[in-house]
Structures are given as structure tokens and as C-alpha cells.
């Protein structure tokens, strides 16, 4: 099975990097074939082109319409703030896979 690409975008990067680490650990544990990467929101239009799903950190939720416009054929969603706040790697991974 080909790996799916889950790309997270945010403004700061620190908490998203931690979330990516937790998501990767859960993907490995449950053998979910994904590649998970984090980028600054300024690269959404460029990097998002190769993603299977694009997730935005809650702090840039206001950018959702703009990024959906840049990536009209991609699922683009805002990460649930509760899952993001708890750095719930499994919860965010499940939501990402469901969106693909």
C-alpha cells in the first residue's frame, strides 16, 4: 500500500513538531502507512500540492478559506483544538486518515 502524506501547517512550529512526533509514533505502532511532516503556513500552497490531507494548527484556523482556495482538490482541515492542546497524536492521526 502506498504511503499517504499528511502535512501539518502552523505559525510557530514548536507544538506542531511535538504533535508530528507523537503522530509518527502512533502510526508506527498501528502500522498506518503514512508520511507526516510539518511546515510553516507560508509553504502551504507549495508543499500542500503533494499532500493527501492538509491539517492546519488551530492558531491559523482563520487561514482555512485561503488555503482551501490554494489547494482546491485537497482535503484541508483545522486540527481540533482539544486534540492539539493535549498533543493527542492518535486522535489527530485518526482524524487525518478519516479525511483522506
Predicted regions and their residues:
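Short acidic active-site motifs
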Residues: 42-44, 63, 88
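Alpha-helix C-terminal capping/helix-to-coil transition sites in glycosyltransferase folds
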Residues: 49-50
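Conserved hydrophobic residues forming the short capping helix/wall of the S-adenosyl-L-methionine
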Residues: 27, 68-71
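N-terminal glycine-rich "phosphate-gripper" loop used for MgATP/nucleotide binding
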Residues: 53-61
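Short, surface-exposed alpha-helical segments at coil->helix boundaries
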Residues: 17-20, 61-65
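Structural signal for conserved beta-strand scaffold positions within catalytic alpha/beta enzyme cores
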Residues: 38, 56, 78-80
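Conserved active-site segments centered on acidic
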Residues: 2-43
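Ser/Thr/Gly-rich flexible loops in soluble cytosolic domains mediating phosphotransfer, phosphorylation
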Residues: 5, 75-100
Amino acid at each position: 500500500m502506498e504511503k499517504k502524506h499528511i502535512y501539518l501547517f502552523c505559525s510557530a512550529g514548536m507544538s506542531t513538531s511535538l504533535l508530528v512526533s507523537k503522530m509518527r509514533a502512533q502510526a508506527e505502532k498501528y502500522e498506518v502507512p503514512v508520511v507526516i511532516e510539518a511546515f510553516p503556513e507560508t509553504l502551504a500552497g507549495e508543499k500542500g500540492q503533494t499532500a493527501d490531507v492538509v491539517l492546519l494548527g488551530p492558531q491559523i484556523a482563520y487561514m482555512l478559506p485561503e488555503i482551501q482556495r490554494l489547494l482546491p482538490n485537497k482535503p484541508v482541515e483545522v486540527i481540533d483544538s482539544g486534540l492539539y492542546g493535549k498533543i493527542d497524536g492518535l486522535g489527530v492521526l485518526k482524524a487525518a486518515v478519516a479525511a483522506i
